[in-house]
């Protein structure tokens, strides 16, 4: 049953997502993982993959669309104030006791619903930190980027509404001396302004994971650009709204936020979105090619986890190389460098490359006779 408001949501302990468990990585219910030893430690965290659990281990319900039975808080991030960070899990209970197993998906959510999940420099610091942790977690294949809600003030929903204009200075968004401050009078004069959300965009673009924007409400300004930079986007039919407000506040995303949008929806439509700053629905964005799926609001989590389940059935190496290949055409020499590095690493795995290395270390001439000039 689903409790009303932000109370605990409990649906029982069915497999995660409408398509069942994450079978591709050996994480279906009750089955040991051939890729991940249940007794092994999680990369970047302490403790085994398979754990005993009880109801007291469930995390708080951080959003109305968040099902605590499907998630656990990621250890080491208890100090987050502007975000929440959770790892997908499958939980079972039976005659042999209750067990919990990690799934290859994480949920990263803006947690400032009272200001439409606007970001400040502190928010961006946290966002980079958790995304980089996900990047370095070798058992995570999908990152769900979303926004908690609704707003306690008016019940409105937001994915992210961009930079918090209250603390924007002449040189960028400013740190405040008091993390809870809401106005410019608390700005810390010792720290320069920031626009490092662009560093987050680059991280999303280059991390070898599929980043899915799960848009449950407003995606505006810098939040609109984050959805554009993400690999995939799922939007709420009832509450998702898209609006590029940069020009309204004397700002502009002249990088990924505009260039990639033009790739997705075409030059004329992208210019309309920026120049006119109109509000667009999820159905509009779907028709234009800026969104992959539109689902009912209460199905957002199911749909996002289904994406993650399907991605987990694919080759991690193939997903990695496909992402970098898609990026290559738009990222110039920087994109070529990323792709070239990954291609070189793949070449290192061949017997031919091993022969070259071993010959050097053994101070002999390499024997290439077993490696034809294939065509």
Regions found by a protein language model. Give the residues of each.
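Conserved CoA-thioester-binding segment of acyl-CoA-metabolizing enzymes
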Residues: 2-9, 13, 24-25, 29-32, ...
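Amphipathic alpha-helical segments at domain termini/boundaries
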Residues: 47-107, 111, 278-312, 320-331, ...
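Terminal peptide-recognition signature
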Residues: 108, 112, 126-127, 145, ...
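Glycine- (often His-adjacent) and acidic-residue-rich active-site loop
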Residues: 115, 147-199, 250
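Charged catalytic carboxylate motif
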Residues: 122-126, 196, 203, 303, ...
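Helix-loop "lid/cap" segments that line or gate small-molecule binding pockets
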Residues: 273, 285, 325, 329, ...
